[in-house]
């Protein structure tokens, strides 16, 4: 079994005095023998606090790699403070794969010009074409694309770029083409650069800019793997036919086959074993063994330190408590690597019986093998505050604008008359009379007005990019292994329920889970319309520190970037959409907010479905509580084994939950996460640019 990666803590005297940590026995005393018949499930032991402090009192020198390992196992929320990552100053930051909390470390994108977003959208569409990697070298086909880009209306393109921006109607539509000749030629050059890499790897980095990328592939999932996974779905659906688990709040349209919100780790309820002894072969032997971990009533106070997560002057940089849960945590399964480099589960997948479904375990192991190259492609490692390791594009396609002022006539076309299009009056915006910021005229849709137009910058000269990842998580974390959270779900539509609504913007998990990347396997779609995942990111609120402009003279910049830069201009960047078609693998880092689009039945007289496997990668830099620590909590699993075993004990261990209790915890967990998502969305929306404050 892979060793747990020991987190290196910083604990000062104030923490030791003010924060009460759970009392857990030393490593040597916490071992539980699988064959033991003693009932060891008990409340927290009363071993001395000094034993825990011994885990926590390592010097900061350990953070620089001077101490590679520690005796024992350490987990945030157990024998480390739940908010242990808050302890670092900027000069102490350890490596992480960022998590997309509002204004979090490593999760902000540089603001992109509308032309760059348009380029990303155009290239995303072109790489969906069959044999795009060959067509992009065919001059006749490219000329046809060029003519389409030159003549087609850009209204839809512009509205997608500006979608969700509450003040975008105050920014005039560019009168010049967004897709200029230079922009189009850059796109073709970039696609020709990506084509050989796609042929070699099957991977397409898409919607990529400045160190952030999404990865799609329609041939990464082999026919054999797809067959294995489809068989897994059919097996589970058949076994659960008499007791279908419809996800709460989905109007009985989302069937959970495996979901981490059922039987999660529950503080002060779940049995816990400090050392990672519960594996998939002996998991049920540990039922009833272990200790409770008390609910966390107060987070550690690290004082006014600059921390590694986020910094907002109004709250000293502390993370809002809603971002972490002191009640629940999803349970990942531990994954090690065999000698040949392939993935192997060393602990059970929560809610997937390890004895009943060995073939499904094998299939998901193969899916992890498939996902790792895509994760390597899209993960960005933050080594230090100003040092990052990433694959592919790591800078904008446009020169950074450091100085721009509306009084500079070279930034504008000469005065001209143009018509404000009627087609921008969408029913989800309240269009009426609008004011053009640069001139102050009243603009009425469909009327001719007089004004000047911003000259949009052209992209830099194209330079080839090496998309090869500089490192692989399989090699980097070979000794410690990975932790992966698994979800298997089927969206079922019927003539009575023909429409699936769009989802909400979110990142995956809370900070407890430390999810750093997602891999989605779209296995099977029948009689449903196309669906997409939409992506967006937060941008830095401190843009005014980098761009010099006069007082309130930033209207040209607003037109270039397609956003308000004064009060109320949210620091949110739309990246675009990726189709979630059958047979596709989609991977992305957990720095993007994303949401699923709505879809419906094609033929509303027949049922339809969309089925997918989700793999969520826990940041391997920091170990969290997993199924290697928590014996199975499903009472029915134990009951089946107990009945089959001759002379088995009849008393039900107190650590087990009924389905009804697990469902109650799921509802509470979902309610807690809804509050977190609302808080995160509020914090993201309230971050605004401050160009008006000079």
Feature map (PLM): residue ranges:
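Fe(II)/2-oxoglutarate oxygenase catalytic core
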Residues: 2-5, 9-25, 33, 39-585, ...
